[in-house]
Regions:
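Short, conserved catalytic/metal-binding motifs centered on acidic residues
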Residues: 41, 79-92, 119, 173-180, ...
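A short, flexible helix-boundary coil/loop motif
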Residues: 1-21, 29, 127-136, 145-149, ...
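Short amphipathic alpha-helical "interface-anchor" segments enriched in bulky aromatics
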Residues: 88, 289-320
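Domain-level cores of phosphate- or acyl-group-handling catalytic modules
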Residues: 142-217
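Extended, non-catalytic structural segments that build the interaction scaffolds
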Residues: 25, 31, 275-300
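Active-site-proximal, Lys/Arg-enriched surface segment
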Residues: 55-130, 135-138, 246-251
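Electropositive nucleic-acid engagement tracts
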Residues: 6, 10-18, 28-94, 162, ...
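Electropositive, glycine- and tryptophan-enriched low-complexity nucleic-acid-binding patches
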Residues: 40-43, 51-54, 106-171, 259-279, ...
Length: 372
């Protein structure tokens, strides 16, 4: 706990009772092997259950705390990116803050529960992710649909806007899964000064940019036909370390995002009779195909944070219903995962996926067969 105490000493606005409680909480979460809730935390420590409930309602600067912790852990010369994703958390009852219908990836359907948006910093060279800030998706507004209301995309952007000041200075790229590849979100991220690396639909509407001579009169020609992923002859080919993975890249115009993108088609020929592909992109048209592939592959580290927080830190076991206590719980679980989860398992899984080159990019669920 010496490192945690040193970080708390560097933070302003932390009272001695709050400091002592946080040190106790971190240590207790490491030794608790049952459900991590207020009752079991009090059983494994000298702190009363009501004290846990009271402190969980007090504000704590988790983003600042995690920022100081990462400054001690991340080498300055390593390549770093940020990742953002949301995860479903089961929750029963009727009066819990944020209770709504959300997509549950494990069940592949919409279910009643909570959703938590997480922003993490990913060390691309070490292939490891660090949780920075977790925010719960707010409940739907009671405003009539005829009036303009904030959407979940607006919430994700606001979460990013609040967390961006805590990023390491070298972070310039953000990676997101295909659910975030919306014009409103991509435009908002770029407005903050970051580039987006994400995934497009297999049937994305893309247009080649016209590179030929222009006519002396009339409007200048911008496009040179629709992109067909069955014909990659106009793409630049790049080999990878995996013999069955090949990258094809080109700068095109995205009709849905209304901007130029560098698109990378990752073709998997492991089954020659049925090759598969996914379509990645970056808003930075100067970024090479290998880096786009490497950055998106590193995005999967945020999934390990969610997995370990749920398995080892009681992410879905909170005995609270109000917004402040839930916010404290989700952030404490993500931090507790970093300090107490069996990091060797995460590293082994990440290394195994990195060797195959297909952990988060070419899984069977999201591959698409090339039309011959």
């Amino acid at each position: 706990m010496t490192i945690v105490a040193e970080i708390l000493d560097c933070m302003s606005g932390i009272s001695n009772p709050q400091r002592n409680f946080f040190l106790t909480l971190v240590a207790t979460m490491l030794v608790t092997r049952t459900r991590i809730n207020f009752m079991n935390l009090s059983r494994h420590s000298s702190v009363h259950e009501k004290t846990y409930r009271r402190h969980f309602r007090k504000p704590f600067a988790f983003a600042r705390f995690n920022q100081l912790a990462m400054q001690r852990s991340l080498p300055a010369h390593h390549t770093k990116i940020f990742a953002q994703d949301a995860s479903f958390s089961a929750k029963s009852g009727k009066h819990t803050y944020g209770l709504d219908q959300f997509w549950n990836g494990c069940a592949s359907k919409v279910e009643k529960g909570l959703e938590v948006s997480l922003i993490s910093i990913v060390d691309v060279d070490a292939n490891q992710g660090f949780a920075l800030s977790a925010h719960q998706t707010p409940p739907p507004s009671a405003t009539p649909k005829t009036e303009q209301t904030a959407t979940r995309i607006d919430f994700y952007l606001e979460h990013l806007h609040q967390t961006a000041p805590y990023f390491p200075p070298s972070v310039k790229y953000g990676v997101f899964d295909g659910a975030y590849a919306k014009q409103k979100f991509v435009t908002g991220v770029c407005a903050l000064g970051y580039h987006v690396v994400s995934k497009l639909r297999a049937d994305a509407n893309l247009l080649y940019l016209y590179q030929g001579a222009q006519k002396p009169r009339g409007r200048r020609r911008q496009f040179d036909g629709k992109v067909s992923l069955a014909d990659l002859t106009r793409f630049e080919k790049t080999a990878t370390d995996s013999p069955h993975l090949t990258l094809y890249s080109v700068v095109v115009w995205s009709v849905s995002l209304q901007r130029r993108l560098r698109v990378v088609v990752v073709v998997n020929t492991k089954a020659p009779a049925k090759p598969r592909y996914v379509v990645l992109f970056s808003t930075d048209t100067e970024l090479c195909a290998a880096d786009i592939f490497r950055f998106y592959k590193a995005r999967f580290q945020i999934e390990f944070i969610f997995r370990d927080a749920k398995q080892f830190a009681g992410f879905s076991e909170c005995q609270a219903r109000d917004q402040a206590a839930l916010h404290y719980h989700f952030n404490a679980c993500c931090h507790g995962r970093q300090r107490g989860a069996p990091d060797g398992a995460s590293r082994a899984a990440a290394a195994s996926g990195a060797d195959r080159g297909e952990v988060s990019v070419l899984d069977d669920e999201h591959q698409t067969t090339i039309v011959q």
